[in-house]
Amino acid sequence: MVEVERVRYSDTLEREKIRAMIKARKEKQKEQSFENEKAVCPECGSRNLVHDYERAELVCGDCGLVIDADFVDEGPEWRAFDHDQRMKRSRVGAPMTYTIHDKGLSTMIDWRNRDSYGKSISSKNRAQLYRLRKWQRRIRVSNATERNLAFALSELDRMASALGLPRTVRETAAVVYRKAVDKNLIRGRSIEGVAAAALYAACRQCSVPRTLDEIEEVSRVSRKEIGRTYRFISRELALKLMPTSPIDYVPRFCSGLNLKGEVQSKSVEILRQASEKELTSGRGPTGVAAAAIYIASILCGERRTQREVADVAGVTEVTIRNRYKELAEELDIEIIL
């Protein structure tokens, strides 16, 4: 009996030692990665550091000094040269995302009737597999909250795709909507309205501005409802949203007008000067941005008409005329029409 207890005690000690070694190794790797981010070459002071994964070394790209050695590569042990090879060899799923109601952590039964070895499923088992696949789809959305999220997030994805918004905006919008659901802000409001308001808030947070009119075009609710819901959720969730800058609209408007980088740079310069003199305060950012682009296109010899600029910016020609006259007068810009 005593001998058995000794064996158990020694096994426990051995396990604790292994855990301590693993923990120490992880901490060391974290420290090394943190140091590597801040590291500079002690020989020449360069920050151009290159990870040589074949030799497991951290090397200065300028003078060739080996700064660190024997670091562990935590990536996969296999290599893939195209998408098909990557899909075949990968043993994990897609990363977690807030744009799916279950954050992408649930499983699904593939529609290709094949087993893990790639062999075709027998016809005798296909009926059972069909039933399993059907019930697996059902249990992914099991209650009212999940159904709400599934519908709202699909709406967010549809609107974001129609507006050509990047992945970061979609993730931010999904997080805003989830917070609204957690605080029970959806009650008494349409799912489409809250989703559109969350997308508008995410655009402002990520400095990828879209106007309420643009959001209205791709949503199924009115501009008035989007604005009202946006003000409500931004107040209740205490969202920190800075006023939209006209500069944020310049790249998109210039791209829509097929203008060169010189015009874009000149437009940004005009807007910065206008901001310093507080000429942008109390005015719509799209109108000011459109006026700056109109002036810059004339100065750089790539003239666009007021109608063309107005169509891309979603404002009227009168707005552009008023704003460009103000900018030209206050900034002493001579425009030859």
Curated annotation (Swiss-Prot):
Any single GO BP term: transcription preinitiation complex assembly
Gene3D superfamilies listed in its UniProt record: 1.10.472.170, Cyclin-like
Alphabetical keyword list: Metal-binding, Repeat, Transcription, Transcription regulation, Zinc, Zinc-finger
InterPro entries xrefs: Cyclin-like_dom, Cyclin-like_sf, TFIIB, TFIIB_arc, TFIIB_CS, TFIIB_cyclin, Znf_TFIIB
Spans through the membrane: none
Domain of life: Archaea
Gene Ontology CC, one term: transcription preinitiation complex
Pfam families: TFIIB (PF00382), Zn_Ribbon_TF (PF08271)
Each Sequence repeat, start to end: 154-237, 248-329
SMART domains: CYCLIN
Recorded GO MF terms: DNA-binding transcription factor activity; TBP-class protein binding; zinc ion binding
Residue numbers binding Zn(2+): 41, 44, 60, 63
Zinc finger motifs (TFIIB-type), residue ranges: 37-68
Family that this chain belongs to: Belongs to the TFIIB family.
NCBIfam families in UniProt: PRK00423.1
Function recorded in the entry: Stabilizes TBP binding to an archaeal box-A promoter. Also responsible for recruiting RNA polymerase II to the pre-initiation complex (DNA-TBP-TFIIB).
Full protein name: Transcription initiation factor IIB
Organism: Methanosarcina acetivorans (strain ATCC 35395 / DSM 2834 / JCM 12185 / C2A)
Originating gene: tfb
